[in-house]
Amino acid sequence: MSTRPVEGSAIWDVLSPHSPHAAAADGKTLVWVEAGELCGHDTAESANLARIRPGLLAAFCHPKATEDDLTLITKWMAWLFLLDDRIDESDLGRDADLLDGHLQDLQGVALGIRTASGPMSRALEEIITQASAGMGDAWQLRFRRNISDYLLACVWQAAHRQAGEFPDPEVFPHWRRAFGAIMPSFDLIERTDGGALPSCVYYSRPYQSLLTAAADLVCWTNDLMTVDKEAAHGDLHNLVLVTEHDRHQDRRTASAAVSAACEQRMRAHTSARRDLTGLTAALGLPDTVRTHADDCAASLLVWVRGHLEWGLETPRYRPGTTGTGTD
């Protein structure tokens, strides 16, 4: 089990409910993975996916989701785990041009300009189609764009690995959110929690601040949990390692700095949520929209806390394990 990060943080005061559909979502997703030949004949890869339980992560992060929506989100998370591991643990993750070519089919599907031609792209096409059902055009375009940004960020990460460079600490948080696939994952909160937010809310300064604060919390607490594993793997794309290198600090001091940054993001989320309440009132939005906006703001922190709970349980974050390895 991973060491509990940010001990004493206000994030531990956030309730962490759990969907009752986790096991069902895991089971249906594993059947889907096999039927779609996402793992081919790689039994170790499919066994690893079963072991890390994407359905449990979905259940922690989306406790209000219906069983169908939770299964959809579990498929999305399983798809991400498979792609991330294939990139990170092969030459793809260290050759930006090779990876860029490899991802063209997925990019075309994400942007709606290409028909899927392989198992992973067909799976992505299905996920996008199912996620888009009942959602408006603006949400659908945003979801596609955010997936495309994630794929582009994987190439950025590969270019830095290829050069053996530590990321610039000033721009790293932006790219960390992107290659963590946080924004398309957060888009799904609107699907499970009542529908797409109007653009005047979603693109407002308060809601964008809420998204950024919550996304940073997911990424940075993840980095605190995984720093030893990633350091052993030679992966520099971890905020603790970036801080350690940039400030010439030891691991403990750098970890403390990242923990302090997490607390700052918690305060930023609290402030932005208060500002969002004021904005939706000033705009004269219907009570249903104002309540939905506040519910989505609260659900962002539930997502952060849910990811933490799963991270403490999953073997995925333990030092000495790989995507297809054993505990």
Swiss-Prot record:
SUPFAM superfamilies: Terpenoid synthases
Keywords: Lyase, Magnesium, Metal-binding, Plasmid
Binding-site residues, Mg(2+): 84-85, 222, 226, 230
Single GO term (MF): metal ion binding
Protein purpose: Catalyzes the conversion of (2E,6E)-farnesyl diphosphate into (-)-delta-cadinene. Cyclization mechanism involves an intermediate nerolidyl diphosphate leading to a helminthogermacradienyl cation.
Catalyzed reactions per annotation: (2E,6E)-farnesyl diphosphate = (-)-delta-cadinene + diphosphate
EC number assigned by the record: 4.2.3.97
Pfam families, per the entry: Terpene_syn_C_2
Metal-binding keyword on record: yes
Protein family membership: Belongs to the terpene synthase family.
PANTHER family on file: BETA-PINACENE SYNTHASE-RELATED, TERPENE SYNTHASE
Full protein name: (-)-delta-cadinene synthase
